[in-house]
């Protein structure tokens, strides 16, 4: 067991346009090589495209709903018992839920064909908003794995 104290959570300020802490965390996840201004440009451009395509007045509400649709509820964790390793289903902590959803959205947006990340991100957010696409499939696969290993749920720690 670690003798050190737990690291304190950093409080990040909201983003400059919408004042949302969640959106600022998303921008930080999109950022590569410390280029935050480029990440902001990509995310704000994607939000505008997203809101325009869906006819939303407030892009932030649509973004939060898309993120909510992508959040996993259960995941599997490896647990070694004796000589065997079991995939034990556990509930995902609230912070980790949003973190995983953001990572999946960004990963699938980057893997979309085409050069423009802004367009890929907007399309992935639209897919999440409509409960379809690669991110939602990843979430369903995670839930399916947890459901398949429900027999090992008593190995929780």
UniProtKB/Swiss-Prot annotation:
Keyword rRNA-binding assigned: yes
UniProt-recorded name of the protein = Small ribosomal subunit protein uS7
InterPro entries the record matches: Ribosomal_uS7, Ribosomal_uS7_bac/org-type, Ribosomal_uS7_CS, Ribosomal_uS7_dom, Ribosomal_uS7_dom_sf
Annotated organism of origin? Chlamydia trachomatis serovar L2 (strain ATCC VR-902B / DSM 19102 / 434/Bu)
Which Pfam families does this entry report, sorted A to Z?
Ribosomal_S7
For this UniProt record, the keywords arranged alphabetically read as follows: Ribonucleoprotein, Ribosomal protein, RNA-binding, rRNA-binding, tRNA-binding
What GO CC terms are in its UniProt record?
A: small ribosomal subunit
User: Which Gene Ontology terms cover its molecular function?
Assistant: rRNA binding; structural constituent of ribosome; tRNA binding
């Amino acid at each position: 067991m670690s003798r050190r104290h737990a690291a304190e959570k950093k409080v990040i300020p909201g983003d400059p346009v919408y004042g949302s802490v969640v959106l600022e965390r998303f921008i930080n996840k999109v950022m590569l090589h410390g280029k935050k201004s480029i990440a902001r440009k990509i995310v704000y451009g994607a939000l505008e495209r997203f809101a325009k395509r869906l006819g939303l007045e407030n892009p932030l509400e649509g973004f939060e709903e898309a993120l909510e649709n992508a959040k996993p509820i259960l995941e599997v964790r490896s647990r070694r018992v004796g000589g065997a390793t079991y995939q034990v289903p556990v509930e995902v902590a609230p912070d980790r839920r949003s973190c995983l959803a953001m990572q999946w959205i960004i990963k699938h947006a980057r893997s979309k064909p085409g050069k423009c990340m802004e367009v890929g991100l907007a399309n992935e957010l639209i897919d999440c908003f409509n409960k379809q696409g690669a991110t939602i499939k990843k979430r369903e696969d995670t839930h399916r794995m947890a459901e398949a290993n429900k027999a090992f749920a008593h190995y929780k720690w």
